[in-house]
Amino acid sequence: MKKKVTINYDEELNPSIKEARMRRNKDVNFTSFILEPQYLNIGLNKKYLLKTYGCQGNLADSENIAGILELMGFSPCNEEIDADLIIFNTCAIRENAEERVFGEIGRIEKFRKQNPNLLIGLCGCMAQEEHTIEKIKKTYPYINIVFGTHNIYSLPELVYSSLIEQKNKIDVLSIEGDIYENMPVKRESKYKAWVNIMYGCDEFCTYCIVPYTRGKERSRRPEAIIEEVKELAKAGYKEVTLLGQNVNAYGKDFKDLNYTFGNLLMDLSKIDIPRIRYTTSHPRDLDDLTIDAMALGKNIMPHLHLPVQSGSNEILKKMNRKYTREEYLDKIKKLKEKIPGISITTDIIVAFPTETEEDFNETLSLVKEVEFEGAYTFIYSPRIGTPAATYPNPLTEDEKKERLLKLNDLINSYFLKGRKRFEGKIVEVLVDGESKNNKDMLTGYTEHNMLVNFASNKVKEGDIIKCKITKAYSWHMLGEVVE
Ligand code: SAH
Ligand code: SF4
Ligand code: F3S
């Protein structure tokens, strides 16, 4: 039998949820990323594999991680067997997200045994959790380096100490630090880009782990964002998606500037880039200026992801969402009036602790009223350290699943209705490339963020083309390219 590879960490800085919960009145500093010369070239002739889970925030972070690694000389690979360094950029949002990562880490052990020089790293939101770190030490003691969401910039030092000095470290900061501008970035796409506009979240929805794993809300300066979008436009990018956990809180932390998300959208809409999207919006903070900017800005796409979570006022209150069903519906009405044809998508949690049949029916009735054209629906998952994890939840697993199925059945009918409205119409599609399911078809997204499959040998990735929609389904549409 091969010996189990077990790592004892040479240095440990472990996360603390208690520390992470606190919000300090400290000014945000902006720092530039610099790669120290001793870290250059240590990845030469070595390959890395990055496995990313979770939201767009993590996808964007992974592009920075890849940028840093390539600056250090590493080159990318697709197969675990070829890798000298495997990094898991993880998500902690629900228990099943965590289980997936642990499953993958368990599976990776065999590569560690085959290649004793393989380095394994873990970062992202799970690294910010105390129980994850405990579990790593106990059950997966072959991970070489652990770092958190607040210190991606530490990666070169951690790789260096593990690879060159054979010192393995856990290095997780519980409290957010400076905003790093000019991080190296290796963008996945040549025509669609993520642009972080802010970090962290101060909403503290009672079910959610994000305010603990991502720290307090910190906005990037408008000039830096505008400059980045201008550069992307110049480089031929067709679409940018502005990122933040609660983009509508953008700018609220500026002490010297009265500048909000609406102002930013207005300014960005003047840049010559075809498509601007953003995610995610918090319904309470979505204001008139933002709606006006969406209505006026020709390049602000007519799609809004506005997570409602529940249709019951009682549950919204227990979730600490700080808006009522009526206020949410008012905003939807305003959006539909000011931006005719806007597509609205959402997130919904079922079986939140104490959710009664009546509460759940309120959610169903809200779905009928809004007619969402897309949604992510979840069964509530308790997160250690969040208030809701201590609330009583008497529902059985079967009852929870039943609610999810019932909700999905209803909501899917509106996905179809939302796409049917485009049958026979001509829409603009940003071409993504080959369809995953059918190599003879191309695929892309409309302005309303709906997937279209079509056949053509004349168009290429990154083109914005006109398509006539021939058939609509719940999850996608078929189209024909119009000359
Ligand atoms: N900041 C965004 C996204 C947060 S995470 C927002 O506020 O909308 C994405 C979604 O995951 C949430 O909208 C919520 O529906 C879901 N979610 C978050 N925590 C959850 C939990 N503990 N159990 C189940 N779903 C959860
Ligand atoms: Fe989580 Fe709420 Fe913040 Fe979204 S707004 S990240 S759901 S705490
Ligand atoms: Fe997951 Fe963290 Fe994003 S918990 S959803 S990766 S902010």
List each model region and its residues:
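Terminal RNA-binding accessory module
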Residues: V5-I7, E12-P15, A20, I34-L35, ...
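Structural recognition of alpha->loop->beta junctions
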Residues: K137-I152, G262-I273, L296-M301, E362-G374
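Short flexible coil/turn linkers enriched for glycine and charged/polar residues
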Residues: E188-Y191, C201-E203, I300, S310, ...
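Proteins enriched for Cys/Gly/acidic motifs involved in redox and nucleic-acid/cofactor modification
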Residues: K2-Y250, L289, E326-E337, N361, ...
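A structural motif corresponding to the C-terminal lobe/cap of the Radical SAM core domain
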Residues: I300-P302, E314-L430, S435, L442, ...
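Conserved SAM/AdoMet-binding glycine-rich loop
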Residues: N117-L122, E129-H131, K234-E357, K368
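Conserved, mostly hydrophobic/aromatic
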Residues: C205, I225, L242, Y278, ...
